[in-house]
Every structure is written in structure tokens, then in C-alpha cells.
Amino acid sequence: MQQPTSAVPRLELRRASKSFGRVRALSDGDLALWPGEVHALLGENGAGKSTLVKILAGVHQPDTGELLVDGVARRFATPAEARDAGLAVIYQEPTLFFDLSIAENIFMGRQPVDRIGRIQYDAMRREVDGLLASLGVDLRADQLVRGLSIADQQVIEIAKALSLNANVLIMDEPTAALSLPEVERLFAIVRKLRERDVAILFITHRLDEVFALTQRVTIMRDGAKVFDGLTADLNTESIVAKMVGRDLETFYPKAERPPGEVRLAVRGLTRIGVFKDISFDVRAGEIVALAGLVGAGRSEVARAIFGIDPLDSGEIWIAGERLTAGRPAAAVRAGLALVPEDRRQQGLALELSIARNASMTVLGRLVKHGLISTRSETQLARQWGTRLHLKAGDPDAPVGTLSGGNQQKVVLGKWLATGPKVLIIDEPTRGIDVGAKAEVYGALAELVRDGMAVLMISSELPEVLGMADRVLVMHEGRISADIARADADEERIMGAALGQPVGHPVQPIPPLGHAV
């Protein structure tokens, strides 16, 4: 690990507390950021991370505690004061002016002018082009922001921070909406910033990013710091145990049981230009992971199996019965359930209650005398909420008020209420905190113990390796590898995702007759 280049931290928060009315959001906020160090800030939702960051950024003022910048006590009354002291926050969804150029966004409110007050656009463009080049990105100062990806917009925010001479960068879930290549580019930029002695606070739920990028970790729980130490001294299990406050025998509680009969069989699924000749089986009591890079066709295969997207050819069988393609209602009746990738847009009606969302797939069962029984609806929501450890006080509260992890549990409960034989779950833990991840993994393990067949689409390799009995890897619309749990590792999976041979070719799967 790179040693600190300063005798004092670049930024230090000591014993900070903050209350909102009777709610104590932060009781013991301690943090020290050193020059040239990437420091992870971890904790479940509600642990106090957001409050701590807002104190650093000047959005909130602490009730008690001390803030020091380069060893000098400071108190930021506004975000502008924090910015002037060299602090910048990069949010996962940047706030830029789409109809202005990159240069105009970076210099908004502080454009250089000549002696008679005219804006010096050439000087702006030269400086911004230099900043972008120093970050190693292919962007131009005169490009409009409209149409740029979230990843490119984050780069603009970083360049803006550097133009303001920021020496502390706070990155709040910066990779949540990025593809794998975009994440790698962001990591390369962060490493360049380290070389310039910038102190970086990196907030994430993805533990693989913590181990890949950071040198030090602070873990928060219930508004207080519970750990501060070197990343190299930690592993996944120890981080999770510190975050949730209890020992976990394993983060991935996959039950070892022999697989049963084939529950889902697909043969020769093809959608021209999207995927071709997809064939595989998923058995009762088995989790099969579908891995691959973004754009490989994984989610499209899942949507086609469920009947949302069309097929040009191929067969789908559920528990020995052939499924009529292109009809989601028939898929549900046959025993298929799909938890989609984007729970907020595709899995929930955010303005409706938790109870209504949890019962939406089985409302027909809850109708009495032509009206939906709200009592039955609430009972159903409480039943699945208890089983999935849903943290929600009032089932009548809008589901949009829940954390990401609890929203995912509602979507899962909604589909489990249909009594499926096969569960397809797309990115099961995207955007949820580590404690909620452990609970989702526990729920999946319980379903598998009860004999359910699970097809899990995931971009998180630790999740794939920890939960799957077999790993199917897709590359450019085809299955490039079928890897047993005992043979699976990150190198094999990534190699297959990139189209490289992994040692064992995919074996042809025989066609089905009238029964599986």
C-alpha cells in the first residue's frame, strides 16, 4: 500500500453527531482521508453514510464534533464553502446542463473574461481539453452534454472538480449505472487521481470494487463507526459481519443438495440479431447462473423465455410441458416467475402500497363479492414480508418509500406468491446494500432447498461463484461455456465472456420429445 504523503490527514471528521428532530442519524461519525488514498465508506442503508457525507459537503452542519482540513479546524455553513476548501462530491447521477457544452458546464458561473467582460471561450476550451486529456478520456470540450452516457457525465464532474483544485473527491455509488468497461475506465481515472495525491472517499455496495480499488475501509452501523482499517486485512465475510453486527457462517448460504428433475428446458432459442441457438436445462434444487458482459443477450433470453419478447425459433418446456412462446400469462400459469433487472421500472408500481405490490400477481384470488379484500391483501403481504425479512412497518405505505433491498424483497415475494416451479431472477442484488444482499441470498438458498429451480442472471462474479451450481456464460448472443461449480473461477468465466476457449467445449443438448 502507498504510504500517506502527509503528516496529517487531508480531511478528518471527529466524533460528529447529527439529529433530525428525535431521530439520531449520526452518533459517532469518525473518518480520516489521507492524500493519495482511496478510502471505502461502507454500511447498510440507514447506517449514517449519507448524513456523514452531507456534513463533509457542507449540506448539513453537525450538532457536535470537529472537522479538520489539512489539520486546520473548519466548519462549512454551505456547500460553496466546502467546495472552496477543496471538496467535491461526484454523485451516481450527475446534474449537468444538457444543452451546454462540456466546457460551459465545467466553467458555469466562473467563465474567464477579458478586460471588457467578454467570455474567453478559446481559453475555456483549451483548459478543458487539457483536463480531459489528463484523465485519458476521448471527450472534447466543445461537445454538448446531451446524449452523453452517465459514465461520460461523471468524467465531466471529475474534470470540473479538478478545475476547482479539489483535493478531496467523494464518489457516491459512482458505478451503479455503469457497464463493466465504463467501470474499468472510472477505476483508471481514480488511480490517476491517486497519483496526484487526491484523497478519495468511495461509497459502494459492491465489495469486489472495495478489494480492487481501495486501500482503507471505514464501516458504519447504526450511525456510528464500527471499523476503520486496511482493506488488505479484510475479506467479504468479515466486512459483512461488521456491517450487520452479527457473525455470518457464510455470505453465500448455498445449500448442497443433488439436483432433481428438469424443471426448465430450452432448446434452440433464437431471436435474429439478439441471440442464437440457446439450449440448457435447469433442475429442481439447482441455481444456474447466466453470466456474460453487458450486451451479451442474457436479459433478452430471460424476457423471451417468459414471453415478453418474441422468438424466431426454439422450444421452452416447464416441468415436462411445452410452453406457448410469447404469452407471459401462460408462462405464469405453467409455473414460471420472472424478477426483472429494473425493479423500479419493471417490477413495482412505486406509488401503490407495499401490500398491493406484493399481491399484484394474485389479485384474482383475493376478490370477494367483486371487490379486492384488503384484509387478505395485507395478510399476504405480511406472510411474505415475514418470510423474506422485509423491513417495513406499514403494509399500506407506498413501496417507493422502501430501500432498494426491501423493494427487491417485495418483487420477489410478489412472484413467489404465484407458487412457481421455476424462478428467473435478473441481477438479484443490483443497487442494494450488503446486509440486504445476504438476506436475498438466504431467501434463494431456502427456495432451492425446497426444490425450486432458479435461473440467476448476474454481472457480479462473486455472486455467481458463491451461489451457482453451474455457470452458463454468454458471448455475443451465444452460450460460450457451461462450467460446473467445482471448475468455476473468475478467470474461466471472464475468458468465456470475452469469447476465449475455456478448456471444455459446450456439449450439444439433445432435442426434447413430448416429455422431459
Curated annotation (Swiss-Prot):
Gene3D superfamilies: P-loop containing nucleotide triphosphate hydrolases. Pfam families: ABC_tran (PF00005). This is Ribose import ATP-binding protein RbsA. Keywords: ATP-binding, Cell inner membrane, Cell membrane, Membrane, Nucleotide-binding, Repeat, Sugar transport, Translocase, Transport. Residues 11-247, 260-501 form the ABC transporter domain. One of its GO terms (cellular component) is plasma membrane. It is a peripheral membrane protein. InterPro entries: AAA+_ATPase, ABC_carbohydrate_import_ATPase, ABC_transporter-like_ATP-bd, ABC_transporter-like_CS, P-loop_NTPase. It comes from the Bacteria. The gene is rbsA. It is an enzyme of class 7 (translocase).
